[in-house]
Amino acid sequence: MALDTAQKAQIVAKFARKEKDTGSSEVQIALLSARIDSITEHMQNNPKDFSSRLGLLKLVGQRKRLMKYLKSTNYGAYSKLVNELNLKDK
């Protein structure tokens, strides 16, 4: 269910602004999206796992706040990220 180190490194390398960039909004949103996808798959197999459901909702809210921040500060990076991650643009 959790991302391993290799998957995280691959995501960071793809979305980082510069080398060893792990804190930018783009990287954080991409990592959250990967975790959300993983937990969503888990929830399809385990629909009664309510603690995972609450964790999923928390991650979705966190990603939503980060995306709102990125949209207001750097719209070009926001639109590029939405296209690459196949997310809805609100």
From Swiss-Prot:
Pfam families: Ribosomal_S15
UniProt keyword Lipid metabolism, yes or no: no
GO biological processes: translation
Keyword tags: Ribonucleoprotein, Ribosomal protein, RNA-binding, rRNA-binding
Stretch forming the signal peptide: none
A GO CC term assigned to this protein in UniProt: cytosolic small ribosomal subunit
Bridged cysteine pairs (disulfide): none
GO molecular function, one term: rRNA binding
Record's keyword annotation contains Transmembrane: no
Top-rank taxon, per record: Bacteria
CDD domains linked to this entry: Ribosomal_S15p_S13e
Subunit structure: Part of the 30S ribosomal subunit. Forms a bridge to the 50S subunit in the 70S ribosome, contacting the 23S rRNA.
Protein family according to the UniProt entry: Belongs to the universal ribosomal protein uS15 family.
Function of the protein: One of the primary rRNA binding proteins, it binds directly to 16S rRNA where it helps nucleate assembly of the platform of the 30S subunit by binding and bridging several RNA helices of the 16S rRNA. Forms an intersubunit bridge (bridge B4) with the 23S rRNA of the 50S subunit in the ribosome.
Protein's name in the database: Small ribosomal subunit protein uS15
Organism: Campylobacter hominis (strain ATCC BAA-381 / DSM 21671 / CCUG 45161 / LMG 19568 / NCTC 13146 / CH001A)
